[in-house]
Amino acid sequence: KYDFHRRSFEKISNFTTPRRYRKPVRASSGSPGATWFNIGDGAVRIPASSGSGRRRVPNANIANFMTKLSVNINKIAVVRNSRGGNLPDVVRAALDIERFGAEGITVHPRPDARHIRYEDVRNLKRVLATEFNIEGNPIPSFVDLVLEVVPTQVTLVPDAHDAITSNAGWDTLANRGFLTEVTARFHEKGIRVSVFVDPDPAMVAGAKACGADRVELYTEAYAREYPAGAEAALAPYLAAAEEARRQGLGLNAGHDLNLENLRFFVSRIPWTDEVSIGHALICDALYYGLENTVQLYKRELR
C-alpha cells in the first residue's frame, strides 16, 4: 500500500490484527552507558545501570499501551445529506472504519440533523463492535436518545444549537448542579461520562466534582498554535492532563487534531486514553483513501 504521507510503499498484511510485541531483545547502541531494547516495532533506551548494577527492562504493560482512535463520522453524513438518499451509507462506513483498525466510532447528533441524525445513532448501536461515543449538548431530546441507545460513552459538550462546530468547553464550576444531575442519570444506565473542557485544571477538577469518569480536552487552541511553537501550544494541555491524572479521571482529547500535530501531543501526554478525530481524518481520506488514512492516524498514536 502506498503511504502518501511518507511517500513510500508499505506492506500491510492484516489491518484487524493488533500489533504483536516481541520479547525485548538487546540491540546495539552508539551511546555509552545506555542500552536499547527492541520492543514491538520500536526501540526503548534504558539508562545506565543504577547502584544496584541492574538495568530496568520496560514494563510490558506500559510498552503495549496505545491511545485509542475514535473516528467521528459526522462529515460522512454531511456528504450523504447534501444529496439525499443514503450514499454514502454512514453505517457501512462506520463498520469499514472499525475493520480498518479504529477502536471506536464517535457521532455528534445536533437538533437540526445537519449531519448525523438520531435514527443513524440507533442504527449504529445495533451493529458496532467497538466503543460507541455519542457527544452533544445534553438537552432533553439528546439525553433521552442516549438513555435509549446506551452507548459505551457519552461526551457532554456545551455547544449552541446554531454553532458550526464545538467552540468551547464547559464551565464545570458554574454548571456543577446540572452536570452532576445529568451524569448521575447516565451512570444509572452504566454509561461512561466524559465532560468536554478547556485546558484549565480548575475545569478538570470541576468535572471530577460532577461525577465524570473522563474529561475531553478541547484541542482547537493547541492545533491553532502548534505551528508557531509546539511546546508553548502544549503547555496548558499538559497542566490540565496532569490534573486529570491527579483527580483519577480518564483523559480524552479532540478537535482539529491531525497528522501534523497528533504524535507530539500523545508523546508528551502518553496517558491520553482516546482521541476523537473526524474532520481532518475525512479530509485526508479524500487523498489517501479511508483505509490507509485510518492506519496513518493509528501509526501516529504508537
Would you name each region that the model predicts?
Residues A63-E135, I139-S141, L147-P151:
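Conserved N-terminal beta1-alpha1 strand-loop-helix module at the mouth
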Residues T67-I73, I105-V107, F132-I134, V154-L156, ...:
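Hydrophobic faces of well-ordered beta-strands that scaffold small-molecule active sites
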Residues N72-V90, N133-P138, T165-L173, I191-D198, ...:
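Active-site mouth loops of central-metabolism enzymes
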Residues R114-P140, N175-S194, A232-N252, Y297-E300:
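Alpha-helix-loop-beta-strand connector modules within alpha/beta enzyme cores
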Residues P140-E148, D200-A209, L257-T272:
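Catalytic cores of alpha/beta
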Residues L156-A163, R214-Y226, T272-L290:
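Glycine-rich phosphate-binding active-site loops on the catalytic face of alpha/beta enzymes
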Residues A168, G229, D284-R302:
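C-terminal helical cap(s) of enzyme catalytic domains, especially alpha/beta-barrels
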Residues R192-A244:
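Histidine/lysine/aspartate-rich catalytic loop segments that bind and position anionic ligands
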